[in-house]
């Protein structure tokens, strides 16, 4: 079966938001729990939804903490977000070759659009599914299924690319092929444990992988 659709996670995959996310968590947690959290403590929070993360810390302050996180994240977005090399060129080439491309993310739409505009990727994506569009987040298959439906694509014709186990397991649950990115903050070995079909050392690795898959 030929692959004609590529779905991407956003944070840590298409754009480098690691410092923005870590700083947003530390700001929020230090506001409510001064000096209790260090950088390494918040790394496991990258990937799950904000609601899932903050509800495990204090169920009574979830909405307050989400509001605090999002305000800091919004205010410091452009200064802390960086590009990954070969991402722009690769996505542009996928579009040129006629692939359907979409984004599946657990972020809110407003900050998703900020990141896409900052990185100039906003012109390429046919579909963007955010946490605002679904009841369940990755690794539940719903967000991927929604993106595939909007793209008029079949799971067996799609590849999910991401930097977290939520992306890989989400793709597996939805029936797509999966590609993990080795630049994940959690480390290559962490993602290899979830058995993605492919491991990318740079985003441009996607192009020969897709070419080979569609030739066989």
Curated annotation (Swiss-Prot):
The keyword Magnesium applies. One of its GO terms (cellular component) is cytosol. The active site is at 9 (nucleophile). It catalyses: diphosphate + H2O = 2 phosphate + H(+). One of its GO terms (biological process) is DNA repair. Coiled coil: none annotated. NCBIfam families: HAD-SF-IA-v1, HAD-SF-IA-v3, HAD-SF-IIIA, PRK13288.1. This is Pyrophosphatase PpaX. It comes from Bacillus cereus (strain B4264). The lineage of its organism: Bacteria, Bacillati, Bacillota, Bacilli, Bacillales.
């Amino acid at each position: 079966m030929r692959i004609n659709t590529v779905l991407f996670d956003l944070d840590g995959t298409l754009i480098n938001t690691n410092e923005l996310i870590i700083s947003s968590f530390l700001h929020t947690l230090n506001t409510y729990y001064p000096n209790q959290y260090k950088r390494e403590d918040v790394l496991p929070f990258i990937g799950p939804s904000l609601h899932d993360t903050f509800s495990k810390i204090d169920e009574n302050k979830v909405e307050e903490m989400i509001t605090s996180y999002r305000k800091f994240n919004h205010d410091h977005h452009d200064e802390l977000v960086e590009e990954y090399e070969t991402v722009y060129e690769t996505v542009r080439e996928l579009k040129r070759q006629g692939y359907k491309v979409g984004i599946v993310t657990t972020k809110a739409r407003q900050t998703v659009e900020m990141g896409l505009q900052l990185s100039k990727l906003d012109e390429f994506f046919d579909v963007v599914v955010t946490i605002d569009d679904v009841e369940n987040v990755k690794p539940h298959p719903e967000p991927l299924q929604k993106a595939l439906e909007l793209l008029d694509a079949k799971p067996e014709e799609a590849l999910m690319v991401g930097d977290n186990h939520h992306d890989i397991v989400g793709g597996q649950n939805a029936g797509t092929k999966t590609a993990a990115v080795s630049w994940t903050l959690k480390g290559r070995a962490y993602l290899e444990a979830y058995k993605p079909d492919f491991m990318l050392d740079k985003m441009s690795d996607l192009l020969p992988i897709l070419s080979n898959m569609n030739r066989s």
